[in-house]
């Protein structure tokens, strides 16, 4: 159980990849992945980028961002002796001050019991799923620790980020 679940628990996990993307005013997408075996180095690069973003009028976007990505990133930064950037909500951040769009939260429509996987949301809003490669979320841990497939994990993360942009665009286009 530990081996399967530790990757999802910030106190035991190791961040090896963070992918970010920016949608420019002209609609172009600029994507960047920070990855490597040295977690501190990966987090330091992400911290530097998010520090710059926090000074601008950016929103963080993700699927289960508020309940997974943000706490995971912040806790892993603290564990690695790094200060989480101010754009990441903290214990004293008021709900209306959180600059984040969470597609899982949007799709749940206030329900805490609904299933909200990114794959399911893709199917419901007719956006092609990124889950077409050999890596899936449930095997990222073994793909890294046993198979040394960092490159494939980065590709998996990048696909998730790009499909998230497609979902947000689709939701914004609803009439």
For each feature predicted by the language model, list its residue ranges.
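Metal-dependent phosphoesterase core characteristic of DEDDh/y 3'-5' exonuclease domains
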Residues: 13-16, 25-28, 54-155, 159-175
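Conserved RNase H-like, two-metal-ion catalytic cores of nucleic-acid enzymes
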Residues: 1-52
């Amino acid at each position: 159980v530990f081996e399967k679940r530790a990757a999802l628990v910030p106190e035991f996990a190791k961040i090896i990849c963070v992918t970010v993307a920016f949608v420019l005013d002209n609609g172009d997408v600029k994507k960047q992945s920070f990855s490597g075996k040295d977690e501190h180095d990966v987090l330091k690069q992400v911290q530097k980028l998010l520090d710059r973003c926090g000074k601008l009028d950016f929103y963080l976007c993700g699927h289960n961002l508020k309940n997974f990505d943000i706490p995971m990133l912040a806790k892993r930064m603290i564990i690695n002796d790094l200060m989480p950037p101010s754009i990441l909500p903290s214990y004293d951040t008021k709900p209306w001050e959180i600059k984040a769009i969470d597609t899982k939260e949007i799709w749940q429509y206030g329900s805490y019991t609904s299933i909200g996987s990114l794959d399911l949301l893709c199917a419901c809003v007719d956006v092609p799923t990124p889950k077409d490669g050999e890596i899936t979320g449930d095997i990222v841990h073994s793909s890294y620790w046993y198979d040394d497939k960092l490159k494939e994990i980065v590709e998996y993360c990048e696909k998730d980020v790009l499909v998230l942009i497609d979902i947000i665009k689709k939701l914004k286009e609803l009439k």
